[in-house]
């Protein structure tokens, strides 16, 4: 565990999130949402640009974080996978799953899989996508029940819990960094919108 913690902490503390890349990728995902072949082609071309920027400026977006964690884990002889899926936030994937918009990692430590998100651990965005660097350990080897409230994988196996239903948390309330920092798994309400009736 400590070997992986060293990799993860180094990445989170030395790489910054790039809002420009994020906005470009989000725009192109929307543009090609009905043409997966064109999206894959564009994505493969964009990867070269993204990795050059990662090396030169130590800035990237979620895919770069996930790729770097995976590659460094490989060099340390640790089994690690990139998980693609949906991140829930105030402006994405609230009542229904739209376009996949995020990548994170699953790592096998001592024959057990764990989930982590170096992008969200490294800091957060404010106002006009200004990145604030603030390390949050809560996304490191996170509780799968809590993780599923904001991270919904394309492949169900990466929920890491057979009792979780892939789309159940789409209508649930949002959870943010402080929830993860304190490993506090909210049990209710089940829905983000609660209907209130007068005189009933």
What is the predicted function of each stretch?
Residues 26-30, 92, 124, 159:
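A sequence-level detector of short, solvent-exposed, charge-rich linear segments
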Residues 9-10, 16, 91-92, 96-99, ...:
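Domain-wide signal for the mature, well-folded portions of proteins, strongly enriched
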Residues 1-58:
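Secondary-structure boundary elements
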Residues 63-146:
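Hydrophobic/aromatic-rich core segments of domains that either
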Residues 3, 97, 167-168:
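Generic detector of ordered secondary-structure context
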Residues 40-44, 63-70, 166-168:
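A broad, low-specificity signal for short, low-complexity segments enriched in glycine/proline
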Residues 124-200:
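Alpha-helical and coiled-coil interaction segments, frequently adjacent to or embedded
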